[in-house]
Regions:
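Extended, charge-enriched "interface" segments that sit outside catalytic cores
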Residues: 1-78, 82, 645, 649
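Alpha-helix capping/hinge segments and adjacent helical runs
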Residues: 2-5, 10, 17-19, 283, ...
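Internal helix-loop-helix
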Residues: 56, 88-172, 176, 223-225, ...
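C-terminal amphipathic alpha-helical interaction region
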Residues: 140, 503-649
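A structural-propensity feature for long, helix-poor, extended segments
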Residues: 151-158, 170-174, 476-526
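A short core secondary-structure module
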Residues: 212, 216-269
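A glycine-rich, basic-preceded beta-loop-alpha segment at the flavin cofactor/substrate interface
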Residues: 261-275, 280, 287-318, 335-352, ...
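C-terminal helix-coil-helix/basic helical segment that borders enzyme active sites and/or dimer interfaces
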Residues: 369-425, 560-564, 587, 591
Length: 649
């Protein structure tokens, strides 16, 4: 029996050695306090592995064989309802029979209480079979978990301190419907002319005299927009002056809008209209819909004006999920390419033994392993941060060890998750396009036909740098955080640069010296951007009295004006930051597990010249273009329309 888990040594490394499952199980099981939960990390890991084995088999046996048919059948609108093809229905039904839609939900809500990291591993496995199936599947349990998270955050979930179980949660009925596999949901953000610039959203949330909320407006490109439960971002406050707290993002709120009501007689009353399903280049089996709301009854999530805050709860995990989705797609493309190259003979030997093709295959394999290391680490820290925060808030009688975890580990997990998540989303999405494109190239002319599956994977990959926050948005976020951190702690940055340079010549391990050289190049590029930004800022103060300099240099920073060079080079910088982060993670693995040294060496062989080239571009180019566009430059996209923030789609 085929299995996408058993045939993947690198993936299994993370179940054998590469993840601190004991720590993750401890926070997932509320410190092993619950009566019906696991009592040790080892006991939990047995279950986690069984789930991965099951999903690996389902992906190989139930999903992958249907991928081509799913792509051909697509979806269509019929009588106002979206209809999926028989192959898509069969694949999703197999996942529902395995009850995977309830994998991460708490047991008291009918779930299996598994870690999010395990869920993301299943995303990778399913995506390797078909990304459309993975996408549809994710809007079951993913939306149910969002309901729990939102309820916890707004204070409408209560915990029993004695049993460490949820005693009440706001959306219990909807969650139960999803657990039974009878409903799913969507996240409705994008509108015509309002994608990354969320301050331009026009959908409205209005409250009547009785306190009831209603949503009106149109949303487009809504993945799983045919689902029942729509989390909708809508404007509840009119945009005012730039210093108005309700201007821009501050005027957005989040609502839960049921899209329809099924009557006892079997008929359905539509509340939200599905106007059309998009004719997409790829992902033919999944739904991207345009939906409209005409005073649709809605439930406010949290308080008015908190929509962006609640959206980020979903978005961070969604971006990690896209990272794993991309890895599954890359895995499928690499295996297709290798299988074809090993059987296709040219000039007396398989093309897999031709030097350039061998180089392509080696790079693809190395990139996939590197991406998985980045994805697993980002997911681990994001989940640890979320669950430690929950324990700190709700756990009764925290032990001394738990109190130490709250004080020491929680900030560390948050920092690492914030650093790694945009790097993962950027690198995984860009590599998905690169690897699927290379797979098609290795196939040659037949790859350009529908007789072979290479073209489908490329079509499926092309959306990855666009959705859940474009690659350019990830680059701007990483740049803002990186340079902002230097401006806040310049002394710590100088020390870090000095230490990297010292280790690059003094470390006993040759691989550690190489990683340190990579770090030094990254820090040098950052230093250049900060130095140039600061110098330009000082020059702009020529007409400002000296007594006003302190305020200008500490508070009056406008990314549209002051960070022009950094914004120009943001994508080059994030590529350096991603190469650096992967090298650091692989060095950690190689130090603990010597069998990973080969992977680190392969990564460095490719990353070092790449980073040197990017460093050269950052430190020597950009002035000509900035001089040309500065006089009439349009305002840069902003999440709020005000200085100091960068958008997230």
């Amino acid at each position: 029996m085929a299995s996408y888990f058993e045939d993947n040594d690198d993936l299994r490394f993370y179940f054998d050695d590469g993840v601190d499952w004991a720590a993750l199980a401890e926070v997932t099981e509320y410190g092993f306090r619950t009566a019906d939960g696991f009592k040790t990390g080892a006991e939990a890991l047995v279950f986690y592995r069984e789930v991965a084995e099951l999903v690996g088999t389902l992906a190989a046996e139930e999903v992958a064989p249907r991928a081509a048919q799913i792509d051909r059948e697509g979806v269509h609108l019929e009588g106002g309802e979206v209809v999926s093809g028989p192959a898509m229905e069969a694949a999703c039904a197999a996942l529902r029979r395995a009850e995977l839609q309830k994998l991460t939900l708490p047991r008291e809500l009918g779930g299996l209480n598994a870690p999010l990291l395990l869920y993301f591993f299943t995303d990778e496995l399913i995506a390797r079979g078909d990304v459309a199936v993975m996408t549809q599947h994710s809007f079951y349990g993913g939306m149910a978990m969002a309901m729990v998270a939102f309820s916890v955050q707004e204070g409408t979930t209560t915990f029993d301190p004695e049993t460490a179980r949820i005693s009440e949660t706001r959306f219990a009925a909807a969650i139960d419907e999803i657990v039974r596999g009878e409903a799913w949901g969507s996240m409705d953000i994008t509108e015509p002319d309002a994608g990354s610039d969320m301050a331009a959203l026009r959908a409205r949330g209005e409250q009547d005299e009785a306190g009831n909320w209603f949503v009106s407006g149109q949303k487009i490109f809504i993945t799983s927009g045919h689902g029942k439960y729509h989390f909708v971002i809508a404007r509840t406050e009119p945009a005012g002056a730039p210093d108005d707290p309700f201007a821009g993002l501050g005027g957005l709120s989040m609502f839960l809008v049921p899209a329809y009501e099924d009557r006892p007689d079997g008929t359905r009353r539509r509340i939200v209209t599905v106007e059309r399903v998009e004719e997409k280049l790829g992902h033919h089996g999944s739904v991207a819909a345009a939906v409209s709301f005409d005073r649709a009854p809605a439930q406010l999530i949290g308080k008015r004006g908190e929509g962006f805050k609640y959206m980020l709860v979903l978005m961070n995990n969604a971006r990690v999920g896209v990272g794993f989705e991309c890895i599954g797609l890359c895995e499928a493309a690499h295996r297709q390419a290798r299988a074809y190259a090993e059987q296709r003979r040219s000039m007396g030997k398989p093309i897999a033994r031709h030097e350039m093709i061998a180089d392509y295959l080696d790079e693809m394999a190395t990139d996939i392993q590197a991406l998985r290391a980045l994805a697993v680490t980002a997911s681990f820290h994001e989940e640890m941060a979320q669950k430690l925060a929950l324990l700190e808030r709700f756990a009764p009688r925290a032990t001394a060890r738990e109190q130490e975890m709250f004080a020491r580990d929680l900030p560390r997990h948050r920092r690492r998750a914030r650093r790694l998540t945009p790097l993962l989303k950027y690198l995984a999405a860009e590599k998905a396009v690169e690897i699927t494109r290379r797979n098609l190239q290795i196939h040659g002319g037949v790859g350009y036909t529908r007789d072979y599956p290479a073209e489908k994977l490329l079509r499926d990959a092309l959306v990855m740098p666009i959705y859940e926050g474009t690659s350019q948005i990830q680059a701007l976020m990483a740049m803002k955080d990186t340079l902002g951190g230097i401006l806040k702690r310049p002394r710590a940055f100088v020390q870090k640069l000095g230490q990297a340079r010292w280790r690059s010549v003094s470390a006993r391990d040759g691989l550690e010296r190489r990683v340190a050289r990579l770090q030094a190049l990254s820090l040098s590029a950052q230093q250049h951007l900060v130095t140039r930004t600061a110098a330009d800022k000082l020059r702009s103060l020529g007409d400002v009295p000296v007594q006003g300099w302190r305020k200008a240099l500490t508070k009056e920073w406008d990314p549209k004006r002051d960070f022009a060079l950094a914004m120009l080079h943001a994508e080059r910088l994030i590529r350096i930051l991603a190469d650096e982060a992967v090298a650091e993670l692989l060095l950690e693995q190689a130090t603990a597990h010597p069998q990973r040294r080969d992977l680190l060496e392969r990564w460095l062989d490719r990353a070092e010249p790449r980073v040197r080239s990017l460093h050269e571009e950052i430190t020597t180019t950009g002035e000509r273009l900035l001089a040309r566009i500065s006089p009439a430059a349009p305002p840069a996209p902003s999440a709020t329309g005000t200085p100091g923030t960068i958008a997230a789609e």
